[in-house]
A protein has these predicted regions:
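Class I SAM-dependent methyltransferase Rossmann-like catalytic core
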Residues: 21-47, 51-52
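A conserved beta-strand element that flanks and buttresses the S-adenosyl-L-methionine
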Residues: 133
Length: 238
């Protein structure tokens, strides 16, 4: 019987940065569908809206999306800015060249979005951003790697970090394993979706990681379906 007391340290298939082809395209399409149906996108959108509303005089935003995948969430976040009568420029980062090409095509109609092929853990960022966002991305790292990345992001984030990631729980694990086994056409999704849950974090683990990285001001909220929404302020409480 699988236990969930500790994070699974197994690598996901998609952690191979050289993987490419139709299987990856199918994986990205299905992930977008899963996030839309299970409300995953709304977690990031709601967090960004909270940050934007807390700065009513600011009308232009620079936003980075780490591990951006298809880029779909940047399109959704841009709608939030427009609803708040703001403008924005988005930079998506992914270390897989094939995924970068996919995202560039997916976001081609939005001139405010650019996609860069970059390893965010090891490569320098080109600029400072108002908001740095990461959805379903940070569970790919070990706790030590994540601390290093968060320390690095302190210097790159002017206002807030927004994190949307998985809560490690048996119900979430077996539910997504059953759903993807039944409906998914992607061997990547069938393997990686449940493993992602097993690699997710408990709330207490997030607190430990943030404290190790030197963050004092943050809000962590559990959100359906088995996600944590984090809004982190690197330099102040707002």
């Amino acid at each position: 019987m699988k236990t969930f007391h500790q994070r699974d340290d197994a690598k996901e298939i998609l952690d191979d940065l050289k993987i490419q082809g139709e299987a990856v395209s199918q994986n990205l399409k299905e992930l977008d569908t899963i996030n839309s149906l299970l409300g995953g996108n709304t977690i990031s959108v709601a967090a960004l809206k909270t940050v934007v509303k807390s700065h009513p005089k600011k009308t232009h935003w620079k936003i980075a999306d780490l591990g951006c995948g298809s880029g779909h969430l940047m399109l959704e976040m841009n709608k939030v800015l427009q609803q708040q009568r703001c403008t924005g420029v988005f930079t998506g980062f992914d270390a897989n060249p094939f995924i970068v090409q996919y995202a560039q095509a997916h976001c081609a109609d939005d001139s405010s979005i650019r996609i860069l092929c970059q390893n965010v853990l090891t490569d320098p960022f080109p600029e400072i951003y108002d908001v740095v966002h990461a959805a379903l991305f940070l569970h790919h790292f070990t706790a030590d790697e994540l601390v290093l990345l968060l320390v690095k992001l302190k210097k790159q984030t002017a206002i807030a970090l927004v994190i949307n990631d998985l809560h490690r729980h048996a119900l979430a694990y077996y539910a997504i394993k059953w759903l993807t086994g039944l409906f998914s056409k992607s061997y990547l999704v069938k393997n990686d979706a449940a493993l992602s849950v097993a690699k997710g974090f408990k709330k207490s683990e997030w607190k430990t990681i943030l404290e190790r990285a030197g963050y004092k001001y943050y809000a962590i909220k559990w959100v359906w379906a088995f996600r944590h929404q984090l809004i982190i302020y690197p330099n102040s409480s707002s």
